[in-house]
Amino acid sequence: MSTSTAKRPFDNKRAGSPDDGTDSDSGGNNSGSSPASKRRERKPGRKPLETEAKDKRTAQNRAAQRAFRERRERKMKELEDKVSQLESLNKQSELETKFLRNQVTNLLSELKRYNPELPKKRDSILLDYLAKQRKASIDSNPDFSAAANKAANSKDSSTAISSSNFQFEFPWKMDPSKIPSPSSDSTSPSASTSILDNANNKSVSSTNLNHSRSSISNSSSSPSNVNGLSSRKHSNTLNLYQTQSNVTSEFDFDSQFDESVSSFCSKLSMACGTKSNPIPKASPVSTPSSSDLLKPKSNSNVNITNHNNNKINSKDLSSSAPLHDSASASALNNHDSVNAVSNQFSVDKQYNDSSHSQATPNGLDNDSSVSAWQQPSFGQLGFRTDQLFDLDLDSASPITKQKDNNYSTTTNNTNSPAKADGMYWNFNTPLSNMVSRNMQNPEIPFIDTGLAFPDYDDPLLDILKEEQENEQVEGDSDPIQALINEEPSMPLCHDPAANAGASVSETDKLSNQEEIVQDIIPSNDGKLLKCSEVWDRITAHPRYSDLDIDGLCLELRTKAKCSEKGVVVNAEDVQKALISHMQ
């Protein structure tokens, strides 16, 4: 391509004029068959491009566009990564801010609770400090500077905010030189922190209230221990600040608050129960309260046997001796048995004392034929129409007292079924049947489920039945008729199998109590690991990702023990569990 060929069509056009129309036409017709005619047909001012140059330029343009697209995609990807990183940091900072705000609120509430005379000015100063710090953060952003200045001008600033040298910092971000002394007034956050720690320890110990009731009651009943604990907390305030100042400014929220730690510890703490679901580890049958109540049942059985023997002896004496001698002897023996029962059952002592003064015509007491299990209980006193609002037996109606005296007389003269305070007891029933029922359910001796809510007669109807009862008493007071109606009774001491079964049940209950005592131990041994320490040991394992956390938690729950600080596990058990799960 040359310069002359490019300018030729333009020169030819300028050479031709309107006067030379024939020449131009002839020239145009002559050039129609030549190669120059093709060049003349193109638009003027356009340079003709060769094929190689055009292809090369197209390839360069496409390469440049491709490189631009790659750079744009790479830049967009970097921006997207940066945005996602900033979003995660923002979410983490928001979560941390929310946690710290809640912590400050809890500290203020605890401070108000333990120091109600605290002036409200401190709260307002703290809130003003927080507001000023937020204002400083807004001023650093140019977008919100105008709005922040307008808000600051519309409100009156307090004297605390007017200090320009103030800078709010968290304790772990402060320098050791700037930490206030414990004796100054600015130690209220530290005091509230120690109070919060003390409250947290109390809340943790309350989760195991069923297992460590005695230790907690002792510690809470002595105010000197509480005062000593609070004084030690306040004395360690400076050490707390110095420890927190060594922490880096970057708060590792994920490592400090791992969700898996809380789930693992919540599952492991089920071995000791929780506040919402206090499940004891032992069965309800073997609780100490029930075993303490049922301990003297063997002694009560012996007393019943002695009572039956005394009745038989007194009747034998009545046939050959005067009536007052036999009555005095049996009264003496029965008085001893009642004293033995009253010593074992302190709950029924008042009832025995009140009813002991009422003597029957034969000289026997009302409660001489009443065993410990026939004393008034909730079901008896709570559903009587004459004692709904007065549970004192001395203030009962005269009709009820007369009824009890009449039935007591009937019981003392004959071996017919006796009625004591609404409960029927047949001393002539073979005691082997009672022992067999006791062996089926050793925790509830001689209790019939039908007597849970006895059917009492209305005291208003006792007036109509008084004549029938008097007639029955007169008929039963005949000694000859009593001897005719007498039925043989079988003493309890002649059944060695029952005594062996009772001893076995007592041994089982004692062993259950020992197991409960062994499960409740203080967590002051260095070999016992708390839940957080167990989790640290599990996560530090090199093959942590291969562990079955749920199975490991279930295995450790069976070996966990309850302490005052929560659930603890022996270090050897943790190591054995890790080894067994890695095989």
Curated annotation (Swiss-Prot):
Any Pfam family: PAP1
Q: Where is the bZIP domain?
A: 51-114
Its subcellular locations are: Nucleus; Cytoplasm
Q: Keywords, A to Z?
A: Activator, Cytoplasm, Disulfide bond, DNA-binding, Nucleus, Transcription, Transcription regulation
**Which residue ranges are recorded for the region named Disordered?**
1-86, 177-233, 275-329, 350-373
**Keyword rRNA processing found:** no
The residue ranges flagged as biased composition, category Low complexity, are 24-36, 177-195, 208-230, 297-312
**Region of interest (n-CRD), ranges:** 265-272
Q: Which InterPro entries match?
A: AP-1-like, bZIP, bZIP_sf, TF_PAP1, Yap1_redox_dom_sf
Residue positions of motif Bipartite nuclear localization signal = 41-48, 120-127
Q: Where is this region: Basic motif?
A: 54-77
Concerning its family, UniProt says: Belongs to the bZIP family. YAP subfamily.
The record's comment about this protein's domains reads: Contains two cysteine rich domains (CRD), referred to as the N- and C-terminal CRD's, n-CRD (Cys-265 and Cys-272) and c-CRD (Cys-531, Cys-553 and Cys-562), respectively. A nuclear export signal is embedded in the c-CRD, with which the nuclear export protein CRM1/exportin 1 interacts only in the absence of disulfide bonds (or otherwise oxidized cysteines) within the c-CRD or between the c-CRD and the n-CRD.
Q: What is the protein name for this chain?
A: AP-1-like transcription factor YAP1
Identify the coding gene.
Answer: YAP1
